[in-house]
Regions:
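Cys-dependent protein tyrosine phosphatase-like superfamily
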Residues: 2-109, 123-161
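A phosphate-binding catalytic loop at a beta-strand-loop-alpha-helix junction
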Residues: 109-119
Length: 161
């Protein structure tokens, strides 16, 4: 069991090393989050996360350079994937890369500015595997409205048949 508490705003309790962030569980092996700070990476690893997926482009306001994140992940013993998704620029390579990252060590934590783009990549990777209702419900329970990507999900689900 991961020692994680969910909060409205990311905070850290360094005295007990208990991670308290806005982590949202999508599956037993995947949580998504808004921007993760460098010190959080080691805490995530100590909390049990094995893979870190960064969906935030370096040039986005407030983003931490992906090379610094990669080093923090390596120092913490985590697998790291940099899959930057700019709003509205979803590609088959990003969807595939996200799915491949999820096949790595588990559990994984994926982040972007709000967690929405990470959730979108997960959802699109589930097209044809889970029902549309299951995907939308899972995202909704985590606080994300994916109605805008339903047409793409349907297209991908049809292509996977």
């Amino acid at each position: 069991m991961l020692d994680i508490a969910v909060a409205d705003a990311p905070i850290r309790d360094y005295a007990t090393e208990r991670l308290v962030m806005d982590l949202r569980q999508l599956t037993p092996n995947l949580a998504v989050s808004p921007q993760i700070d460098l010190p959080d990476v080691a805490l995530l690893a100590r909390s049990g996360f094995k893979t870190l997926i960064n969906n935030r482009p370096d040039d986005e306001d407030g983003a931490i350079d992906h090379q610094l994140m990669a080093q923090a992940a390596a120092d913490a013993g985590m697998e790291y994937h940099y899959l930057p998704l700019r709003p509205g620029q979803i590609t088959p390579d990003l969807i595939h890369g996200f799915s491949v990252a999820l096949d790595g060590p588990k559990p994984a934590i994926a982040f972007c500015r709000s967690g929405n783009r990470s959730t979108v990549l997960w959802a699109l990777g589930q097209a044809g595997k889970l029902s549309e209702a299951e995907v939308l419900n899972t995202a909704s329970q985590a606080g994300y409205d994916l109605s805008g990507v339903v047409p793409l999900m349907r297209s991908l689900a049809g292509a996977s048949r």
